[in-house]
Amino acid sequence: MTKSRSSKTSRRNFLKLALGASAFGPFFLFPDRAAASQKTLKIAKWAHFLPEFDQWFVNVVAKDWGTQNDTKVTVDIVPVEEVRERAFTEAKASKGHDIFIFPWPPAEFYRQAIEHDEVYDMVAGKYGAIQQLAFRSTINAKTKTHFAFADFYMPTPLHFFQDYWAEVGMPLGPVHYFSLRGGGRELRKKLGVSSGLAFSSTLEGNITLHTILYAFRAWLLDARGNVLFSKNAFAVTALKYIQALYQESGSPEQLTWSSGGNIRAMLARKTSSSTNAISLLRTAEKRDPELAAKIRLQPPLLGTHQMGVTALPHVTNCSLIWKFAQNQAGAKQFLADLIDSSRTGYEQSKGCNFPIYPKTVPDLILRLQKDPQADPPYKYVELQDALHWTPNLGVPGFASPAYMEIFNSSLVPKMVARMLKGEQSAEDAAASGAAEMQRIVDKWN
């Protein structure tokens, strides 16, 4: 009898406590259950060349979005040289992050990616239709859908030391590939300073060599994705140019540089010029302003055979949502909302991240004309037409799975290395390179 009354009293007290607590919300009684019910969003992102940008992305963009959307957002920063391997590991396991952000078009993973057309549609209402660079970098020609979402790119201008080039009568720097070769040859003879173009199997080496081939009309694949390389004289001509440039003005280090090697060489004044995203110059401005004042920018070198001024993007920032993502809806919304921070992203990247959607940074040209860190302030105005001279990886076609495998496997740097080391002639290197390209194309067809 006593036990029964005691039991009823305890139960009654518990109900009173529970009812009273309910006025303060459901998290009061069950904190573990509340935390478990919170949505999560997992992001893997390539490591930006300027670490402060990633700090802002993690501590401001991701954190604020998570707070506003009741979502726990985690961001893992992945070194550029490890991005492809990490992505393959996740794709194979069908497990990992919700969003994977690449510094290039992730066409190789289109089968594991959702269709991103909806994300582009979400952005279109505020910032306009998808831009050409984004379209050609993320469209799958077979499925007619987008395998990723592109929001910014990094142009690849020429960086050169004005005082060095003034020594050979070119204070404004070389304007085409033949003045780069001639001036570079004289500079090495006179000052012992070599050309600083990257030829190694790195991101910058790939971009540099793919750009030279494209500028010489030595296209790897045609607009339909068929192998075109070595089917005309352009390929051998381009390779012979690279060979002459290396022999007359280069150095053995160009073939062995690790990621960022060309930047380190420039900052040490060991080279006279290099092609790179402006992270090179921004790094110089931060570490040694006097050194940075001697570095000038130039639009890409003028190509041959009416190719004009052109250079492939050093980075095409592409975000991919996996089919196995646990929070696809949140991932789509995050990417659509990310565009709203493009203006601040441009500032946090010190101008490295050029907007694919012009409306997001409408005063871009004014910013380039008067940069607060540049000496002189108008130094960056050379980039005002960057969107016009920056085609997509894969041009004249799209960034196809085959092209991106050719790119990411460093087929071109390896082909060039065999020639520069004397293992193959330019003709044999072109032929063997074309055969490797054909094997990759056949694999994807």
Q: Residue ranges of each PLM-predicted region?
A:
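N-terminal secretory signal peptides
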Residues: M1-S10
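Extracytoplasmic "Venus flytrap"/periplasmic binding protein-like
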Residues: K63-Q131, D163-V175, A265, R269-S273, ...
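Hinge/lid segment of periplasmic solute-binding proteins
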Residues: F102-T156, R296-Q298, D375, K379
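Conserved C-terminal helix/tail region of periplasmic/extracytoplasmic solute-binding proteins
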Residues: I114, A166, P372-D375, D385-N445
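Short, solvent-exposed loop/beta-turn-alpha elements that line the ligand-binding surface or hinge
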Residues: V119-Q132, F199, A218-L239, K286-P289, ...
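Extracytoplasmic/periplasmic solute-binding protein
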Residues: T143-D151, T156, L180-L228, F234, ...
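Glycine-centered hinge/linker elements that transmit conformational signals in sensory
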Residues: G183-E186, G225-T256, P300
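C-terminal lobe and pocket-closing loops
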Residues: S279-E290, T304-S410
